[in-house]
Regions:
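Surface-exposed, charge/polar-rich loops and edge strands
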Residues: 1-411
């Protein structure tokens, strides 16, 4: 059964609470990064950002050590303060389309991850796993939680609401069009209740953060072989944010292709027509309205694509995914894209207004064809994870998108 653990978080002081946390580093443009750092020189970004001239000449190990030094400096300056007692942290945020997310920040068990009680739906890249493991080994903290989800459970919901009412410390702030609220749950009774109710869950599912969880597991295995490194046992868990599956918002993750692999538009349509039904939908952005329907934009027109033969009931869960159908029948068979992860002809556009963005890119002549997919449902994600299979790259774009530095897990 699932194990979660309280921990002594390192958190921004009340004075720095509003401006300390940050979005994913990669989500900032160079200009946004520059402006954010100028406006908030003591933000989490200031810890992980290295000036280009430094980044160019330092070895990875030296860059990671510099991150650790800057982190320790902010603790010394009391920008960051470590809690004195272990706690769970109930975190509530309002993000995309005024959608409210509420869950619990806790340490998730590396043992559960290794035993597949924490289930995966995405393949990881060994090089990225090892790079982040080395980073964690040097800095000894994790500031970006893995997003985990669990089946809706009224008992857990009641326990969380009770813990919120009992909390002695609550903080609220807003930044970048988002609102945030956190409750520090450090009384023993509520900690025991939350530990117990989550302990009755048979499986947790990774919604976002496959590389982070894999890297934490790699590091834990390495530390296990080094007795001198085993101080506290915090390394046996990793920073996670757990929310009920009904709260997840899964958006479409769409594809845009540079060229037609040497085919004319007519030849391309003829080849698609062998396996798929094609319906012209006009010149305005058309979004897939159901599973097994794919939207396509080509040469000024939108089309609806659907399989000529229904998916057989004995097909695997992975073969029934629209991302896999597109990969099998179009990207690989017609366009010659055998590896979506590495082929430079394919790019990805996610979320709202993505078909409009695809239309613009193709009309500008930058790309040849684009495909829109109906968002994958949580039951599909769980079915893939339960089967031990993995989805094609960029199959899901999931909210909430979690900020780094709200609670920092030190080990």
């Amino acid at each position: 059964m699932a194990e979660i653990a309280p921990f002594k978080a390192i958190r921004p002081s009340k004075e720095h609470l509003q401006n300390f946390s940050s979005k994913s580093y990669k989500s900032y443009t160079d200009e946004e990064l520059k402006n954010t750092l100028q406006k908030n020189p003591l933000s989490f970004l200031s810890i992980i950002h290295l000036k280009k001239n430094l980044n160019k000449f330092l070895k990875k190990s030296e860059r990671y050590q510099l991150v650790k030094t800057k982190f320790e400096d902010l603790i010394a300056k009391k920008v960051l303060i470590k809690d004195t007692t272990p706690a769970f942290y109930i975190y509530e945020t309002v993000q995309e389309d005024e959608h409210l997310f509420c869950g619990i920040i806790a340490g998730a068990s590396v043992k559960d991850y290794k035993n597949n009680l924490i289930k995966k739906h995405e393949a990881t890249i060994t090089k990225r796993e090892n790079t982040f493991k080395t980073y964690l080994k040097t800095v000894r903290f994790n500031a970006a939680p893995v997003l985990l989800t669990f089946p809706d459970d009224p008992i857990i919901e009641k326990a969380i609401q009770t813990a919120k009412r009992n909390a002695q410390e609550t903080n609220t702030w807003s930044n970048e069009n988002e609102t945030h609220k956190i409750w520090c749950i450090n009384n023993v009774s509520d900690i025991n209740i939350l530990t117990d109710v989550f302990g009755k869950i048979s499986s947790l599912y990774i919604a976002d953060g496959h590389h982070r969880s894999a890297s934490s597991a790699l590091l834990a295995a390495e530390i296990d072989t080094d007795i001198s490194a085993q101080k506290e046992k915090a390394y046996t868990h990793f920073l996670s944010y757990l929310i009920p599956e009904k709260q997840l918002k899964i958006f479409d993750y769409n594809r845009i292709i540079k060229n037609l692999n040497g085919l004319t538009n007519e030849e391309f349509l003829d080849k698609i027509n062998i396996m798929l039904n094609i319906q012209r939908k006009g010149t305005q952005p058309y979004y897939s309205s159901r599973k097994h329907e794919i939207s396509m934009y080509l040469s000024g027109n939108f089309y609806s694509l659907s399989l000529r033969n229904s998916i057989k009931k004995n097909e695997t869960a992975i073969s029934q995914l629209d991302t896999q159908i597109l990969q099998t029948h179009v990207l690989k068979a017609i366009l010659g894209i055998k590896n979506e992860r590495n082929d430079k002809r394919i790019s990805y556009i996610k979320g709202k207004d993505s078909m409009s963005q695809i239309k613009t890119a193709i009309d500008n002549g930058d790309h040849a064809v684009g495909f829109g997919l109906f968002p994958i449902q949580i039951k599909e994600l769980k079915s893939i994870a339960d089967s031990g299979a993995v989805m094609p790259p960029k199959s899901t774009y999931i909210y909430p998108k979690l900020r780094s530095g709200i609670t920092i897990y030190e080990f």
